[in-house]
Amino acid sequence: DWEQTKAAVVASALLSEHPNLKALLCANDSMALGAVAAVRQAGRTGAVQVGGFDNISAANRLIQDGELLATADQHGDQLAVFGIEYALQIFDTGAIPADRKTPVDLITSGQL
C-alpha cells in the first residue's frame, strides 16, 4: 500500500521473525521511513540497513543522520515530462514512441 505506518508494522514483524536480518529494501521512501522507525524501535539501528526509492527530503534527513543507508532518485520530474511528451506524440501521430532511458542515481551520505 506504499504507506509508512503499514511498512513499520511489516518491518517490525520481519525483524521479529528474522533476528539475523541485515537489510530492508523498501519500494519507496515513505515505506523506508516506516522501516527505519521499526528498526529504531527494535534497537537495531546500525545493525539493519534500510534503503528506499524516490529521494524525498525526509529520506535525506535520515541518510544524513545515518539511519537510512540510501535512496534511489528516479527523477520523477523527468518521468512526468516524458509521459506528457509521449501522450502528445500519440495524439499527434498515433505512433507509440520508443522507450526512453532515464537516469537513476543512488543517493548516500556522500552525495548530501
Which sequence ranges carry the predicted segments?
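Hinge/cleft segment of the Venus flytrap/periplasmic-binding protein
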Residues: H75-L112
